Every structure is written in structure tokens, then in C-alpha cells.
Amino acid sequence: MHVSMNDYLIHRRSDIPRVAREGLRFRRRWPEIEGALGLWVASLNGGRRQVSVSVWRSPEDLRRFVRSPRHLRIMRDFRSAGALYTSAWAAERLDRALIWSQATDRLQGRVDGVPHH
């Protein structure tokens, strides 16, 4: 399995509602995405920091999603609204507690070489 994490820091508080709305729309459609196994989201710092952790069958499934028209539109529409850091790693099994713990280590700077806000 392949895990991908997005750590997005929104520049202006006025952009928080539109970023949150789009994130909820995305989450509702998640079961329809080929190769997507899991998605967890978190909102921190009063909503300014949005984190998503997604689990995929393979890196190729993630690449196909990243190249999809819907994802490309979202990246274009929100490019200037915040700063995005991404990281990825392999997971042996779909274990929510373990994967979230690995994500937390990255978010808190406990994994060398992984940028975070």
C-alpha cells in the first residue's frame, strides 16, 4: 500500500471556508476513485492548516489520481491560497492507527527530511 499526506497551510483566514467546502466535496466522492483505499482529514490551527492522509493500492493509483482533471483543477484553483507540503511512504497494511501515527510523526517534524508547517 502507498500512503500520501498533504499538509496545507492557508494564507488568509477568509479562504478557510472555500478550502474546507472543496475538501468536503472531495471526501464525498472518494469511494468512486479507482485505487483509493482510505482517506482521513484533519483541520488544525483554527482551520488554517488542512491535512489529508490518503491510502492507495499502489503509487500508480496515486499518480493517476494526481493527473486527473478534477485534481488538476483543484490544484490550479487553490495554488495561491496556501502553501502545500506533501510526503509519501509505504504501509504494510491498512491500519488506521499506525498510519495516522506515522503521519503525526511527519507533521511534528520527527521524520528527517520531511517538510512540514
Predicted features and spans:
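An amphipathic, aromatic/His-enriched active-site/gating alpha helix that lines ligand/cofactor pockets
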Residues: 59-87
